[in-house]
Swiss-Prot record:
The keyword Transmembrane does not apply. Signal peptide: none annotated. Residues 1-211 form the DegV domain. PANTHER family: DEGV DOMAIN-CONTAINING PROTEIN DR_1986-RELATED, FATTY ACID-BINDING PROTEIN TM_1468. GO terms for molecular function: lipid binding. Pfam families: DegV. InterPro entries: DegV (IPR003797), DegV_C (IPR043168), DegV_domain_contain (IPR050270). Hexadecanoate binds at residue 26. This is DegV domain-containing protein TM_1608. The keyword RNA-binding does not apply. May bind long-chain fatty acids, such as palmitate, and may play a role in lipid transport or fatty acid metabolism. Keywords: Lipid-binding. It comes from Thermotoga maritima (strain ATCC 43589 / DSM 3109 / JCM 10099 / NBRC 100826 / MSB8).
Length: 212
């Protein structure tokens, strides 16, 4: 990453914004803090801002959109912008098997084995940059219904849908259909990148809204 930043500086850029996934879920934010601290000494005329979105995937994308808008408007209080954006984001996602979460250490082995055995699936959220289990439901139908229920929020909003394996795409399209009458002004459907899917496994799907 240092080489990438040096290349950007060599092109004449004097303000660099590095926007990252939650520092509580990824080490990359702290790595970039170290890199930019070193570069500040060599390039004192360049301003670096390393920003923790306190989100992942779709949520991080929504924070990034708000940051871009705020920078164009001349705002400097970007940490406050992140806070404001997070207050307007609601994320819900689930996994249909625990194997990958167990391997990554995010779920205890005994919990994961029991979940796989009796088909109990967690519904998770991102709160203050951390994963939180907000509910547990048995069976896919109940998981989908709970996610839809939680995302029915008053007001205009953007809807983001995310899935890992191709077989999960049908599920997020079902969620989209169930939310179509909820004042949705924009829909984004994205596939989870391998860097995140390696933790969740292919049977992950979710949705999130950003209140406008």
């Amino acid at each position: 990453m240092e080489r990438v930043l040096r290349d950007i500086i060599s092109e004449g850029c004097t303000r660099i914004y590095c926007v990252h996934l939650s520092s509580k879920l990824s080490a990359f934010y702290n790595v970039m803090k170290s890199v930019t601290e070193r570069l500040k000494e060599k390039f004192p005329s360049v301003t670096f801002r390393v920003i923790d979105t306190r989100q992942v995937s779709i949520g991080a994308g929504y924070v990034l959109l708000k940051l871009m808008e705020s920078v164009k408007d001349g705002r400097e209080d970007l940490e406050r912008v992140v806070q404001e954006a997070n207050e307007r984001i609601k994320i819900r996602f689930s996994v249909l098997e625990f194997d990958y979460l167990m391997k990554s250490g995010r779920v205890k082995a005994i919990t994961g084995m029991l979940g796989n055995l009796i088909k109990i699936h967690p519904i998770l959220s991102i709160e203050d940059g951390e994963l939180r289990v907000v509910a547990k439901k048995r069976g896919l139908k109940n998981v989908v219904e709970k996610i839809v229920q939680d995302l029915k929020i008053d007001g205009r909003k953007m809807l983001g849908l995310v899935y890992a394996g191709e077989e999960m795409k049908e599920i997020v399209l079902e969620i989209e259909e169930k939310l179509k009458d909820e004042h949705i002004e924009r829909v984004d459907i994205v596939r989870l990148p391998p860097t995140l899917a390696v933790h969740s496994g292919p049977k992950m799907f979710g949705a999130g809204v950003f209140i406008l």
